């Protein structure tokens, strides 16, 4: 049976918005949980980098909220986490559950691509399979041959093809050091935060003539999907190209995080919100 770790953390008001847990905060907590699991059951992230010259870069992530959880619901939350190798050593996947007094709450699944590091301060590297010493730290039932496939490309195609586009927007940004990790490249939960900025700017600009957009501030996000192609680095300039659509009874925001070079987005984010059965607007 795959190994799980569980522990409790106190909750503070900075983890919440008025409508529930902050998705970017959940992603940060989830990444920390994956690091705890690796340290306890396999090889910790620091040792992977320093001793095994192996990095782990988040490539795909899915975050689902079962029920909204507010600041006044509980003093703490239980984190449950497990990890596995997938794709014959080409992926490491973690699965994180947030529970406790208000269970069920949220589930995060993140798939990382291993890198063979070059040894420079920027932690540059190329995708490579996990080495034999690293693979040996996992139990047989924690190794799966089938690779993870991101659902985001298919979701994006379906929303664009079958959804009703409500509005579009463009929000510039610059990456600063408080948004980065140790290698002076953005920490992946920043994609969630930047997408939220793009969404809120769409609401600010368009809610007057598209009242449906207000749902994205009045209700919590129910599902996020992320897909990463390349990172942003310190002081990189970029923009969030956002669109809002009504699709299959949900309000869906698609965000392309692009650099000044244009072309393929460096990251994609999809946010899904439930729509009320009765639509009455202020």
Whereabouts are the PLM-identified features?
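Hot-dog-fold acyl-thioester-processing enzymes
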Residues: 1-60, 107-222, 276-282
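Hydrophobic alpha-helical segments
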Residues: 198, 243-244
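Short beta-strands within extracellular/lumenal beta-sheet-rich domains
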Residues: 63, 223-226
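A structural signal for short, hydrophobic beta-strand segments that form beta-sheets
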Residues: 53, 58, 80-85, 221, ...
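HotDog/MaoC-like acyl-thioester-processing domains
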Residues: 65-76, 82-155, 228, 232-237, ...
